[in-house]
Design a protein with these regions (language model features):
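Conserved N-terminal segment of class I S-adenosyl-L-methionine
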Residues: 2-152, 156, 171-173, 202-203, ...
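Short glycine-centered segments of the SAM/dcSAM-binding site in methyltransferase folds
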Residues: 92, 183-186
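Activation segment
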Residues: 149, 166-170, 196, 212, ...
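A short SAM/SAH-binding and catalytic strip from SAM-dependent methyltransferases
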Residues: 158-167
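Short beta-strand segments
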Residues: 160, 186-188, 245-247
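A short glycine-rich, Lys/Arg-flanked "PGG" loop and its adjoining helix->strand segment in the class I
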Residues: 171-184
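Conserved class I S-adenosyl-L-methionine
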Residues: 186-208
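A short acidic, glycine-rich active-site loop
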Residues: 208-215
C-alpha cells in the first residue's frame, strides 16, 4: 500500500510539474479563495491561517534542504552575532538546549580560548551536532537541563529558543543560577507581538505558536516580569526579527 502511494504521488507530482507555473499558481490561489468563502468570515480566516501553517511547514522543510541541513535563518538574521558580541574569549559557556549545535559552534569558533558545551536531550539532534565540523573547544552532552547540567562553575549560559518550551520558566531560571553559578544569561525567545496576525489568531481560537511545544510566546512585558521574578536583571534587551534578545545578569542580592 505504501509503495502504491509513493508511485501515485510521483505520478501526480510529474503531472503537476509539467503544468505552466502561472497555471499552477492560479489553481492554488483559486482553491484557497474557494476554501475561504465561508458564510462566517471568521471561519474563512481560520481555514486560511491553518493553510498558512501548512505552507510554513513546507517552506521550513525546503529551507533546511536549501541550507544543507542548517536553516538559512541562522545566516540571514545573524542572531548568532548577538551571542558572540556579548561574550568574551576565555569564558566557560553552557548552551542549554543546543539542538544541532549551530549557536554553540559559532561561539566556539569565535572564541578559541573558551570552553563551550552544548546540552540537549534530543539524541537525533545531538548526533548531528557531534558529526558536524566542530572546533576542539566544543563538546556536546546528552541531558535534561531541567534536572541537571554539566559541572560548573560556568561564566555564561545561552538559552536560544528554549524558555518558551518550559512550563515553570521562573523556577527553571532560578535552578540554573544555582546549578551553573553563571552570572550572565543570554536569552532569545519568540515575541508574541511579531505580527498583527498573532492576536487575531488568538481571537479566532487558532494556534498562534510557531511551535506546538511552546508553552508561551512572550509579550515584551511578560518576558521582563519573568526575568525579574527569577532574580535576574536585564542588562540589555532588543527586539529583532520578531524575537526578544536579552543579556541578563544574576542579581547577587537574590543569589
Amino acid at each position: 500500500m505504501k509503495r502504491f502511494g509513493l508511485i501515485l504521488a510521483n505520478v501526480v507530482s510529474f503531472v503537476w510539474r509539467i503544468m505552466p507555473g502561472r497555471l499552477r499558481l492560479g489553481l492554488l490561489t483559486g482553491l484557497m479563495v474557494l476554501d475561504s468563502r465561508h458564510r462566517d468570515p471568521g471561519k474563512g480566516l481560520e481555514h486560511l491561517l491553518r493553510l498558512r501553517d501548512k505552507l510554513d511547514w513546507v517552506i521550513n522543510e525546503r529551507a533546511m534542504a536549501y541550507g544543507y541541513g542548517e536553516h538559512p535563518k541562522h545566516r540571514l538574521t545573524r542572531y548568532h552575532d548577538f551571542f558572540v558580541r556579548h561574550l568574551t574569549n576565555g569564558q566557560r559557556v553552557l548552551d542549554v538546549g543546543c539542538g544541532y549545535g549551530a549557536v554553540a559552534r559559532t561561539i566556539a569558533c569565535a572564541y578559541p580560548n573558551s570552553e563551550v558545551v552544548g546540552i540537549d536531550q534530543d539524541r537525533g539532534r545531538l548526533a548531528m551536532a557531534r558529526t558536524s565540523e566542530n572546533p576542539p573547544n566544543l563538546n556536546f552532552v546528552e541531558g535534561d537541563a531541567t534536572a541537571s547540567v554539566p559541572p560548573g562553575p560556568w561564566d555564561a549560559v545561552v538559552l536560544s529558543n528554549v524558555l518558551e518550551h518550559i512550563v515553570d520558566r521562573v523556577g527553571f531560571l532560578k535552578a540554573l543560577q544555582g546549578s551553573t553559578l553563571a552570572r550572565q544569561y543570554l536569552i532569545r525567545v519568540p515575541l508574541f507581538g511579531r505580527k498583527w496576525q498573532m492576536p487575531l489568531r488568538r481571537e479566532l481560537g487558532v494556534d498562534f505558536r510557531s511551535d506546538p511545544d511552546h508553552k508561551i510566546e512572550h509579550t515584551y512585558d511578560e518576558f521582563l516580569a519573568e526575568i525579574a521574578a527569577s532574580g535576574l536583571t536585564v542588562h540589555e534587551v532588543q527586539t529583532r526579527w520578531g524575537e526578544i534578545w536579552a543579556d541578563c545578569r544574576r542579581d547577587e542580592n537574590h543569589a
